[in-house]
A protein has these predicted regions:
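Short aromatic-glycine-(Arg/Gly/Cys) micro-motifs in beta-strand/loop hairpins
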Residues: 1-14
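Residue-level signature of catalytic and energy-coupling elements of molecular machines
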Residues: 27
Length: 48
């Protein structure tokens, strides 16, 4: 599994979390659909 750690804003709050996705593009797209803005991918973690 690939986890993408990100920083973003949602409802005026600064957030740092992670999201599982197959690609960085998919991760950003999903975050945008959930209402996140100012998205920056900070780390990529691959787990088995």
């Amino acid at each position: 599994m690939v986890w993408y750690w990100f920083t973003a804003r949602k409802n005026g709050k600064h957030i740092r979390e992670r999201i599982p996705a197959d690609s960085q593009t998919e991760a950003v797209s999903e975050l945008e659909k959930m209402g996140y803005t100012d998205i920056v991918i900070t780390d990529i973690v691959i787990t088995e």
